[in-house]
Amino acid sequence: MAFAAPLLTLVALVVKLSSRGPVIYAQRRVGLDRRDGTRPTLGDRRGLDLGGRPFTIYKFRTMYAGAGRRSRQVWTRRNDRRITPVGRVLRAYHLDEIPQLVNVFKGDMNVVGPRPEQPEIFARLREQLDRFPERQRIRPGITGLAQVRCGYGGTPAEVERKLQHDLEYVSRRSFWLDMAVLLRTIPVVLTRRGAR
């Protein structure tokens, strides 16, 4: 974390000076499913039936303050008006994800793993895709096989394709696969592929 301190400080300063609101954005996500099959499914405060433990994810704020509360839209779209100009740059280079290192140190996430979803999205995808909860057998990650192969996608076909990559990662998970994903993450970040 110390190696990232200068970058974290610079990004935090730019976010703070560019628009009103907090520097860090916190949001509930669905994490590792720690159940052994004997306990009921965990839910969050809204009563959603989740296949994993909810946790708070941290990111640099890339949207105007309160944009999430004013909109019913859950997934971001290309040219989303809720995103600040600085936020577009942060998202393009995935710099908004850096605070998730805190989640890694807390044990909520790994560096590599399936992308953690918001409870509402998780509940919807679990209804649509039978195998979706299988992703929760491991901790979610900052980057993952689906992210480097597919980027960001919200269409049903893209979501299903990403699920197949997540399940492949869950079944083949190893040190060497993690290294391969990390190496493939570098060009994704540098070429701004998959950012919204």
Model-identified regions with their sequence ranges:
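A hydrophobic, helix-centered structural microdomain
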Residues: 1-66, 175, 180-196
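A short, polar/charged loop-to-alpha-helix boundary motif
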Residues: 65-74
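Solvent-exposed coil/turn segments that connect beta secondary-structure elements
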Residues: 65, 116, 151-153
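Residue-level recognition of specific faces of alpha-helices
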Residues: 13, 59, 82-85, 100, ...
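The feature captures the short pre-catalytic strand/loop hairpin that immediately precedes
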Residues: 73-82, 157-161
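C-terminal terminal-structure detector
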Residues: 129-196
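A short, structured surface patch at a secondary-structure boundary
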Residues: 1, 76-139, 181-189
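Positions in alpha-helical segments
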Residues: 12, 25, 84-88, 165
